[in-house]
From Swiss-Prot:
EC category: lyase
Entry keyword Lyase: yes
Protein name per the record: 2-oxo-4-hydroxy-4-carboxy-5-ureidoimidazoline decarboxylase
UniProt-listed PANTHER family: 2-OXO-4-HYDROXY-4-CARBOXY-5-UREIDOIMIDAZOLINE DECARBOXYLASE-RELATED
UniProt key word Oxidoreductase: yes
Source taxonomy: Archaea, Methanobacteriati, Methanobacteriota, Stenosarchaea group, Halobacteria
Biased composition (Basic and acidic residues): 70-79
């Protein structure tokens, strides 16, 4: 996706808006669909807030679907270009066999406990820090971890959104 200016975003038709921002939240174009009615945006932060509000105002089931749309970290599966780049920046695409097995075990434990994959904004992190966060967060209460995971999703979306805009 090429960089956009805010002026261009405000002129997009509804379908083009969803095409441009439908993957900001992993496999969840409904977020962009709900946020588009808030146009025109006076700033990128206003767009970010509209998208975040769309998630926060959604039902818990819809939020759970959003969390479940994220790939397991360190998995060697097909994922969106954005997820692939984020995981590569954290060296999760080149784990040793031992690290890979550790991530598989942690992912399985976490998913069994919470019913959704571990979500973390991993851009420019490292495998050891990510594994430590997984081990720490698996001890959270269900409500604390659900909130933490949603906050991480918002951070990921914010980073992705920033990449879409050129300086005006």
């Amino acid at each position: 996706m090429h960089e956009l200016t805010l002026q261009q975003v405000n002129r997009l038709d509804d379908d083009s808006f969803v095409d441009a921002f439908g993957e900001i939240y992993e496999h969840s174009p409904w977020v962009a669909e709900r946020a588009r009615s808030s146009r025109p945006f006076s700033s990128v932060d206003e767009l970010r807030s509209a998208m975040k509000r769309a998630v926060e105002d959604a039902s818990r089931e819809k939020q759970l679907q959003l969390l479940r749309a994220h790939p397991d970290l360190g998995e060697r599966t097909e994922m969106t270009d954005a997820s692939e780049a984020e995981q590569a920046s954290a060296e999760l695409d080149s784990l040793s066999r031992s690290q890979y097995e550790t991530f598989q075990r942690l992912n399985e434990t976490y998913r069994e406990r919470f019913g959704f994959p571990f979500v973390m904004a991993v851009k420019d992190e490292n495998p050891d820090a990510i594994a430590a966060a997984m081990e720490r967060r698996v001890d959270h209460s269900e409500s604390t971890e659900f909130r933490t995971a949603l906050d991480e999703v918002h951070t990921i979306a914010e980073l992705r959104l920033a990449e879409r805009f050129s300086s005006e």
